[in-house]
Amino acid sequence: LNNQNHCISIFTGNLPPSKALFLRLENAFLICNTYEIIEIVSFKEFIETELRAWARLKGHLYLGREKLKNQYSYKIQKIVKNDYLQKASWGKKMQGIDTSNPKLKDLDLSDDILVKAPDNNGLLTRGIVTQENSPIYDFELYYKEQVWSNPISVLYEEGKNLQWNATTDIPWNEIPNLNPVLEKAICQIMTYLVENEFSALYIPAKFVSKINPYYMEVPLFLSSLMNDEARHIEVFTKRANANGGGFQYSSEVTQKSLFSLFKEDDYIKSSFLLHVMGEGTFVDLLSFLEKYMPDEATKKIIRLSKRDEMRHVAYGIEHVKSAIEQNPNRINALKNTAFKRKEFMDEVNGESSLLIESLAILAGGSDEPDAYKRGFYLVEELKQKMNENRVKRLINIGMDEDLANDISKVHTPNFM
């Protein structure tokens, strides 16, 4: 036995042959390589029969016993094939621990992030070693270019740092009594916002379980994004019901527009329509609302929500931009997606008239003819600004200016 070098030595003391002892052996042999030898050091002299039987049962080779000073050495060689094809890492300590500020970007889970997730990567992430014969999950989104956005770790940290509470962070009792016409306009706007936020919540939820968690940062970020949208639904619902009003009307054009978003099953196309086109335009709408809301409490609601939405847009821009860089042919696919959506929306004439009127009343301050006319003009200016900013975002992701203009012009009149 002296010539048979062992790779692992397990001290079992006075443990008798039992479930506790065999559990330790089971795990030791599970992670060692084929033909490696494991030494069991025990105070027990007469456990050879049980160890030989266990080794035979598991397909290993019992090599024998050696008398040591006050204890005994038993050696078993692993014969069966490896359960793990690589060793787990050890000795790692991530940055930020010593300052009690570890960030997601500081994790060093692997030498590289592969362009394609390993086929056997189940509900686990980089750095976890998978046992052979584990089930294959068949995640639909398993290429990095399908899901990745370069600033995703930073955006995730930002989302945590900028969390706010829709109950305690809004001075609800400071909302003043408003003219019923103005309050009704605000309630109609809040109704519309809630509808759109439900789409922004449900659409990422469709895709989270399809993303291979090898790219861990993506489902984590999308989960934080969904938490943002849930908070927006809550806060807009509360504002609609905070001041003697309540929810108002949903329009066919709004629901049809959101349905065209919801039914898109390609993640890159969905990210393009939702984050780049929709939420990007939504940010301009929120800037408009923040400017013209008549009270500070409602302004704060809009301002905090807009800050979240800007983070979502940042993810989408970098996600789609990266996907286009990897495959420029995607530009044509995204163009076709935008025009296909327009064809679907052409079945409904115009825009949500209830929303546009409410925006005009809000911006003008009342429904008096001159004020309403002024507000309507401001809404038309908003639409132009939305178009200009959409073009900028489309150029940013890699489209030429002419195509960017064409795609922006066919964007849904529902804004989202």
Model regions and ranges:
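Intrinsic disorder
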Residues: 1-119
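Terminal targeting/low-complexity segments that flank the catalytic cores of oxidoreductases
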Residues: 24, 85-220, 241-246, 253, ...
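Short glycine-/small-residue-rich flexible loop motifs, especially phosphate/cofactor-binding loops
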Residues: 52, 237, 287, 391
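Short, surface-exposed basic-aromatic patches at helix termini and helix-loop junctions that form
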Residues: 53-59, 241, 291-294, 325
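Alpha-helical transition-metal enzyme core signature, strongest for iron centers
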Residues: 55, 193-201, 222-240, 272-283, ...
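Amphipathic alpha-helical segments within well-ordered protein domains
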Residues: 205-209, 287-290, 303, 317, ...
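Active-site-proximal alpha-helical scaffolds that flank and shape metal-associated catalytic sites
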Residues: 238-313, 340-341
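A beta-strand-loop signature enriched in Asp, Gly, Thr, and Trp
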Residues: 301-305, 316-341
